[in-house]
Amino acid sequence: IVRVMHEAPPQDIRSVLDELEHEYRKRSRGFVLEKVAGGYQFRTLQTIQPWISEMKQSRPPSRLSRASLETLSIIAYNQPIARSQIEQIRGVESAGTLKHLIDRELITVVGRKDVPGRPLLYGTSRRFLEVFGLNDLASLPPLPDVEPIAENSE
């Protein structure tokens, strides 16, 4: 919207979008305007989600494997992060999983680590925020405290 309305100040555009967001929530519609990934998206209401899910069943599901979700969460909470660090945390080789996440546009190469060999550093993408309905990385749920778990296992 900012690109199309290049003469309007961004704060004016945000103000109008906030007004629209409020209006759509106030009226009973099948969708709302939400802040997602630093921008705005129209999204369906949770109350009509069962019907949307039923309509989507005609397509084969596109789920992430446990390995992909594990790797994605490691990257999300530790970015920027090198493959060797991911593999150290997971305890298994992760090149294939990283390629899969890059192909799905959920992660991206964000730079190189300043050590010998200059390994690639990975981070989450804007698509990651959109898919998981997050406005920014600060919206990630907090990690559970694992200290008590470790103490109980001794």
Task: Mark where each language-model region is.
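A short, conserved structural fragment
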Residues: 21-34, 105-114
